[in-house]
């Protein structure tokens, strides 16, 4: 009994330590004993080590521990059965072509077998998950490595088609529509440089130019590529909105992508290494932007002349600038050296009024039967008589002058209410008129019925005539008898009346119809000289008998007879003239202003 209790206490003492496994697997071996009986030990084949699992949940059987100098098993290489040790003599081009062909076949075999995920120690960190509009994850491990293998195979196939003659891609290869490349912009290293502005250029022209040169599509993506408040809602853009600022280059050809990458990298390197004041790309962009906005200064030396420029160069610049300005002709005034938008006579219609006067003179000459002015004959006459004043009447195009035509026409506010159609000058006083108008007025003073003949003769000889006398020194024209009432044309308007003296000078059937239809109205201030109120007597060749005691038409006019008077009118005497009217009663002579005293230059006041 005591021996049993002592053995139990000894067993508890041996198993009292925690975490110890004191249960023997076999019979204790003693030094003095022989080897243990292997049959007495428990059988270990029944214990199975559970397999480990990958991160994605796939089972992985334990194998031999991999060492750094050991090579793993390559199932794809075993399936290809292609030699990897080249013992023959190959050129570098042949060796490169064989390596490309081998890698293409290896990738194709991996895609067929689905062995696309590399071992765990060769993987890169997984990116944040991304989901589509349906909530399905798009950047799984299999999708990412499959995309990488397909892009690598596409690049290798394009190289193989250029290096290997008559090369045919694998059967399961489908050429993608477009490939893309990413070029990151170092905004974190250079925060003060506007890379986006230099990549885009003025209104995006620099970016369009790079796209035309390379043939690839260039886009700017990432943080900072879109202004705040102008975000886009499309899913592809939102997927890269939080990435670093970069240029996304898309094309179907690898060479185009390489060319676009080179151009983009060149702009980035220039902006980061060249100072802002010496960056020619930025200067040209600013100049182009100013031209588009309309604020460009069109100078030969934009931005100031360099300090090292010599005097000859400055003279050449000034000559070129002066030649350019002298070639500019204003179409408003005809002068040189300024544009029409800068003309001082813009809106004054100077050339229009001069042309209107010239056209009016030509019209009057044509109506008078003199015809249109022949500029060739007039130039010849001016060349023969250089002292004439007709040069001023020629247009600048005939005289060869570059000066602007002078506007001699008075404004409408200074013309007054007169119906004087000959008052077209720019002078304020009535006696200070152009030679043409003064000669015309003098002819109207001296006319004796044949107005147009004298007017035409004096107008043609006005340049060679003697200086005119002032109005108070001119001789008084002879008085003419007033026309009878039946020859007066009071039913016409005031400015269309015909001169009474012309009606008395010639008979209506002997008068020139051409001159009768185009008579001029004398000025208002000369009408008093033609309206001399004399005693109503019959014109020469007419009888004293007629209507109311006035002279009537003579009998015997071819085809006409004396019309009888109205009933009762022949017995009524004419009404007496109003008292005090000179020239009506025949006793009072016509009064004229007295001549000025000696030594007085101006007219009497």
Curated annotation (Swiss-Prot):
Keyword field contains Cytoplasm: no
Keywords tagged on the record: Metal-binding, mRNA processing, mRNA splicing, Nucleus, RNA-binding, Spliceosome, Zinc, Zinc-finger
Main subcellular location: nucleus
An MF annotation (GO) of this entry: zinc ion binding
GO biological process: mRNA processing; regulation of mRNA splicing, via spliceosome; RNA splicing
InterPro entries: BBP-like (IPR045071), KH_1_KHDC4/BBP-like (IPR055256), KH_dom (IPR004087), KH_dom_type_1_sf (IPR036612), SF1-HH (IPR032570), SF1-HH_sf (IPR047086), Znf_CCHC (IPR001878), Znf_CCHC_sf (IPR036875)
Region of interest: Disordered: 1-75, 117-139, 294-319, 376-605
Pfam families in the record: KH-I_KHDC4-BBP, SF1-HH, zf-CCHC
Places the protein is found: Nucleus
Zinc finger (CCHC-type): 328-345
Biased composition range(s): Low complexity: 446-466
Disulfide bond positions: none
SMART domains: KH, ZnF_C2HC
Ranges of biased composition (kind: Polar residues): 376-392, 428-445, 499-510
Domain of life from the UniProt record: Eukaryota
All copies of domain KH, residue ranges: 184-264
PANTHER family per record: RNA-BINDING PROTEIN RELATED, SPLICING FACTOR 1
Protein family (similarity comment): Belongs to the BBP/SF1 family.
Function: Necessary for the splicing of pre-mRNA. Has a role in the recognition of the branch site (5'-UACUAAC-3'), the pyrimidine tract and the 3'-splice site at the 3'-end of introns.
Protein name: Branchpoint-bridging protein
Species in which this protein is naturally found: Yarrowia lipolytica (strain CLIB 122 / E 150)
Taxonomic lineage: Eukaryota, Fungi, Dikarya, Ascomycota, Saccharomycotina
Gene that specifies this protein: BBP
């Amino acid at each position: 009994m005591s021996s049993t209790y002592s053995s139990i206490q000894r067993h508890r003492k041996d198993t009292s330590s925690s975490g110890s496994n004191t249960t023997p697997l076999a019979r204790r071996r003693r030094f003095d004993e022989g080897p243990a009986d292997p049959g007495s030990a428990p059988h270990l084949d029944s214990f199975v080590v559970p397999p480990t699992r990958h991160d994605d949940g796939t089972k992985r059987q334990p194998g031999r521990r991999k060492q750094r100098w050991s090579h793993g098993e390559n199932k794809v290489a075993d399936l290809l059965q292609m030699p990897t040790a080249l013992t023959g003599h190959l050129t570098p081009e042949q060796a490169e072509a064989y390596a490309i062909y081998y890698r293409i076949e290896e990738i194709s075999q991996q895609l067929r077998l689905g062995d696309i995920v590399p071992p765990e120690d060769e993987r890169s960190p997984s990116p944040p998950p991304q989901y589509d509009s349906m909530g399905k994850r798009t950047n799984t491990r299999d999708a990412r490595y499959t995309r990488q293998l397909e892009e690598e195979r596409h690049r290798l196939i394009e190289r193989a088609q250029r290096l290997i003659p008559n090369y045919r891609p694998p059967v399961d290869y489908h050429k993608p529509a477009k490939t893309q490349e990413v070029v990151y912009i170092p905004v974190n290293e250079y925060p003060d440089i506007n890379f986006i502005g230099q990549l885009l250029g003025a209104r995006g022209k620099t970016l369009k130019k790079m796209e035309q040169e390379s043939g690839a599509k260039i886009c700017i993506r990432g943080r900072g590529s879109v202004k705040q408040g102008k975000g886009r809602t499309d899913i592809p853009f939102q997927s890269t909105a939080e990435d670093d600022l970069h240029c996304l280059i898309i094309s179907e050809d690898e060479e185009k992508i390489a060319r676009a990458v080179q151009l983009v990298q060149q702009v980035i390197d220039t902006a980061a290494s060249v100072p802002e004041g010496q960056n020619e790309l930025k200067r040209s962009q600013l100049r182009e932007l100013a031209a588009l906005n309309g604020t460009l200064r069109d100078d030969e030396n934009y931005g100031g002349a360099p300090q090292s420029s010599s005097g000859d160069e400055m003279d050449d610049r000034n000559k070129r600038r002066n030649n350019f300005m002298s070639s500019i002709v204003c179409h408003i005034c005809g002068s040189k050296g300024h544009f029409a938008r800068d003309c001082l006579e813009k809106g004054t219609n100077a050339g229009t009024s001069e042309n209107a006067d010239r056209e009016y003179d030509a019209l009057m000459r044509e109506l008078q039967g003199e015809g249109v002015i022949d500029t060739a004959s007039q130039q010849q006459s001016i060349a023969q008589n250089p002292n004439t004043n007709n040069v001023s009447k020629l247009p600048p195009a005939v005289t060869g002058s570059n000066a602007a035509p002078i506007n001699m026409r008075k404004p409408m506010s200074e013309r007054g209410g007169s119906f004087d159609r000959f008052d077209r000058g720019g002078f304020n006083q009535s006696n200070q008129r152009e030679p043409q108008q003064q000669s015309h007025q003098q002819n109207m003073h001296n006319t004796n019925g044949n107005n147009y003949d004298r007017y035409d003769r004096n107008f043609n000889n006005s340049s060679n005539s003697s200086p005119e006398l002032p109005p108070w020194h001119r001789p008084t024209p002879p008085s003419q008898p007033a026309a009878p009432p039946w020859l007066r044309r009071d039913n016409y308007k005031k400015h269309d009346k015909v001169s009474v003296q012309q009606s008395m000078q010639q008979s209506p059937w002997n008068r020139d119809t051409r001159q009768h239809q185009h008579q001029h109205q004398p000025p208002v201030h000369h009408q008093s000289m033609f309206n001399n109120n004399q005693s109503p007597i019959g014109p020469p060749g007419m009888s004293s008998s007629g209507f109311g005691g006035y002279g009537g038409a003579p009998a015997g006019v071819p085809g006409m007879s004396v019309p009888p008077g109205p009933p009762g009118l022949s017995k009524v005497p004419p009404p007496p003239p109003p008292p005090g009217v000179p020239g009506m009663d025949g006793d009072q002579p016509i009064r004229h202003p007295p001549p000025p005293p000696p030594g007085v230059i101006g007219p009497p006041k």
